[in-house]
Amino acid sequence: MTATSTTMGDTSWFLDIGVVHHLTSDLNNLTIHNPFTGEDKVIVGDNKGLSIANIGKFSLASSSGSFVFNDVLHVLSITTNLVSVQRFCLDNGTFIEFHPSHFVVKD
């Protein structure tokens, strides 16, 4: 990962401390996915509810191993792919140390 985003293919992912789930608008970002059958919606800043099309996961290799991204919500109407800092840390047994110009994932 880089200081502000990580790239998978041509798509950037941005760390977000305010989201509970990872979010993507591109189904191709998920290696495993299933249709979302619930009625839940992703609530955004203006209180608008965005429909969830699918739920899935993917993993990302790093120099020290691999990181998993579970319960990624596929939301067609979002414009930026977001990594939930809280979920990432819980799923991977890590914490993230933020610095002015970069961040470090630690276990």
Task: Spell out what each predicted region is.
Residues 1-107:
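Anionic group-binding determinants
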